[in-house]
Amino acid sequence: MENTEAKRNIKLIAFDLDGTTLHGFAELSERNRRAMEKANDADILVVPATGRVRNFIPPCLTELPFIRYAITSNGGAVWDVLENKVLCTDLIPTETALEVQKIFDDYE
């Protein structure tokens, strides 16, 4: 596949936040912002993918006009950022999470 053909086939770019795209908790570099804009200009969806919950994605990302979706909770939820509503979830049941927490508590 030629490089130009591969570029045309890209439909979505998902990116991690902590220690990669962001510096600190909520600082987006100008270089990263420009790269996201360039992808958006090429009709590529630009999607943050993070272990964070939706409300902890910083405004420096959610206020960008081209950030429409976000994958949160380590892949457990997909959000429509513009509508601020969850599109789908696949979360661990609370009782299972509590059982796991209890196991780890024994190792503190």
Regions of interest found by a model, annotated:
Residues 1-15:
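Non-catalytic pre-domain segments flanking phosphatase-related domains
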Residues 24-28:
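Conserved ATPase-coupling elements of RecA-like P-loop NTPase cores
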